[in-house]
Amino acid sequence: MAKDTTGRLHVTVKTGGKRKLSSKLWLERQLNDPYVAQAKRDGWRSRASFKLIEMDDKHRFLKPGMTVVDLGAAPGGWSQVAAKRVGAAEGKGRVIAIDLLEMPEIVGVTFARLDFLDDSAPDKLLAMMDGAADVVLSDMAANTTGHRKTDQLRIVGLVESAAAFTSDVLRPGGTFIAKVFQSGADAGLLVQLKRDFQTVRHVKPAASRQDSSERYVMATGFRGGRRDKC
């Protein structure tokens, strides 16, 4: 082990056996990531929890009594934070976590194994919530192919689908937050969001790795969706 420029001990993983270089680098990054260690100490399911904590500390979009939908929720780091902030465990607010993968139970969170891309998904969700959501969150990322342009289009397409779903389940004045990656492929997405929301901005929490193009689009002040205009 050696110290890095911050004075912290840096763990180096030896390459041996069948371990690939990519696996070695990923393991080293995890072992030396302070957010990974802090998440374990604080009981969060993933380091991603700190991204939502930081964004909400600054912008205050999660409030007691709100109803929150977490798309692609597994393993549940964002659902944990949302449940705590809206008071779901005390019955003040509600958090609905949606994913195709099973997810261990979280106190105060209702889990739905559901494909949000299915045409019937908005109606099923609205029936579960008995009303519209105040906030829709998405920390999803599309499966990558290794081809940069293809991956960018896949990621933007996923967020566009999440935004379309949101327009069916979000109440006027609500908030939509989704993970995106910095590229020139999201122009259409921004046009869509600026049409449907009063304010649209990009944010990059400190917990997002600095060498990553990851950032979040935050859309606030929902103008009302297709259901409201029928």
Swiss-Prot record:
What sections of the protein cross the membrane? none
The entry marks the following residues as binding S-adenosyl-L-methionine, namely: G76, W78, D99, D115, D139
InterPro entries reported for this sequence: RNA_methyltr_RlmE (IPR050082), RNA_MeTrfase_FtsJ_dom (IPR002877), rRNA-MeTfrase_E (IPR015507), SAM-dependent_MTases_sf (IPR029063)
Catalyzed chemical reaction(s): uridine(2552) in 23S rRNA + S-adenosyl-L-methionine = 2'-O-methyluridine(2552) in 23S rRNA + S-adenosyl-L-homocysteine + H(+)
User: What are the UniProt keywords, alphabetically?
Assistant: Cytoplasm, Methyltransferase, rRNA processing, S-adenosyl-L-methionine, Transferase
Q: Which GO terms describe its molecular function?
A: rRNA (uridine-2'-O-)-methyltransferase activity
Q: What is its EC number?
A: 2.1.1.166
One GO cellular component assignment for this chain's record is: cytoplasm
Q: What does this protein do?
A: Specifically methylates the uridine in position 2552 of 23S rRNA at the 2'-O position of the ribose in the fully assembled 50S ribosomal subunit.
Family per UniProt?
Belongs to the class I-like SAM-binding methyltransferase superfamily. RNA methyltransferase RlmE family.
Q: Record's PANTHER family?
A: RIBOSOMAL RNA METHYLTRANSFERASE, RRNA METHYLTRANSFERASE 2, MITOCHONDRIAL
* Name of the protein in question: Ribosomal RNA large subunit methyltransferase E
Q: Which organism is it from?
A: Nitrobacter winogradskyi (strain ATCC 25391 / DSM 10237 / CIP 104748 / NCIMB 11846 / Nb-255)
